[in-house]
Amino acid sequence: MYDGKQVVRVVTQYKKADLYNIGVEMTDRKGTGNYDKDRTIFNIEYVSLTQNNLYQEVKNNLKTRNIEYLNRPNTNLLNGVTFTSGPEFFQSLGMKFKNSGRTYHTGDKKGQTVMIPDIKSKGDITKAVSYFFDSCMEFLKEYVGEENILLSQIHYDEDTPHLQAYFVPVVTKVKRKCFVKDENGNVVKEEIKKKDGTTSIVPKLLRDDKGKIVYEEVNGKFLNCDQFWKDKGGLSLIH
C-alpha cells in the first residue's frame, strides 16, 4: 500500500484578467506545464465549456442563474482546484512511468529523475487510476455544488496525472453592513476624515451598544468567495 501524499491544491483569487490564460491552458494546452502532445488525446473532460471562452462561460453562468456579484476587476470570479499525487502513488495503482530525461531542480526530489506517465493507449490508464479521479470528481461535485463547476478535466499529458477543475463560489446567504436611517427611511450620511487629511461624505454605519458594526443576513444567490469558504469552515478542511 502507498502511504505517501495525495494533494489537493485550491486557488481562490482568479479574477477577470486571469481567465484568458486559464482557458488557453485548459483548451489549447498552452501554458507553463510540460505538455506531451502524444498524450493529450488521453485527457478526460468531465465538464466542458459551452461558450467561446472561459470568461464568457462565467458571465453566462452567473447571468442565467441570476447570481448577484460585483462586476469589478478585483472581484474573485473563479476558484480552481487540483487533485493529484506523486508518481509513486499512481505506480501503486498500476500505471507505468518512464524516464523523462529531466531532473528535479528544487524540492524534496532535487537531483532525482523526473518520471512521467508511459501512456500509449487507453489501456495504459488502469481502472484504479480512473476510479481515483472519478472519486475526486464526485467529492468535488458534492463539496462545491455540481452546478457551480464550469470546467473540469483529467490531464494525463503533463509530468504527473491530475484532475483540474474551476468553479464559481456561490452562496445563498451573505451578511451586509447596516446603515443608520432617518425617519423617512433614507440613509444618513456623515463626514469622515481620511488619513491624508481630506474629508469625505459616506453612509453612517449602524453600531450596537458596544460600538460594533451591525450586520443583517440577506438571502439570495451571491458570488462571494470569502463567504463560501467561511461557510465551509475554512480552506484547511478540504486538505
Residue ranges, per PLM feature:
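N-terminal nicking endonuclease/strand-transfer module with a His-rich metal-binding environment
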Residues: 1-238
